[in-house]
């Protein structure tokens, strides 16, 4: 499952349709899994770094939980599990804890579930996507959707994760406190 290719269309809207684009973005939803583990040093979370040429030199503020968009009528938790497997090559199952959803700066809503588990971050196998590269060259190249993964303490994760997802780390702490 780690070698499938997914075509991701990139289109630019004329200024006249900017309001339509904003409305569509506000309706977009993602579902993801926040995998965590306990070590002697404390709580660690599993994050992924997006692949492709735009993210190559970005590190702090570029990482994410494994997640992806899902369609209306699709079960968000099943979508989150599928995205986790597509982006990492690992399956995850067990007692999922729903976290409060977060609205991203661009309007996208993220539904996330936390689960305790472990995996070898250095062994991920991500699916691929295709895009024109270099821009306006007429050539298409394939890139991994995720180019690397890692385990981070919460302190480091807050620096690595996308700004709009920091709240998920706080939600994880709150969920663990509620669980006792």
Task: Put a short name on every predicted segment.
Residues 1-24:
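N-terminal amphipathic/basic-hydrophobic helices that include classical n-h-c signal peptides
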Residues 101-138, 150, 172-173:
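Active-site-adjacent beta-strand/loop module that shapes the phosphate/pyrophosphate-binding cleft
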Residues 64-99, 153:
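The catalytic Nudix box helix
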Residues 139-155:
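Alpha-helix-centered segments that form part of catalytic cores
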Residues 24-64, 113:
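N-terminal strand-loop-strand
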Residues 40-42, 52-55, 71, 106-107, ...:
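Short, charged/polar surface micro-motifs in flexible loops or helix N-caps
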Residues 154-180:
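Charged phosphate-binding loop/patch that engages nucleotide di/tri-phosphates or the phosphate backbone
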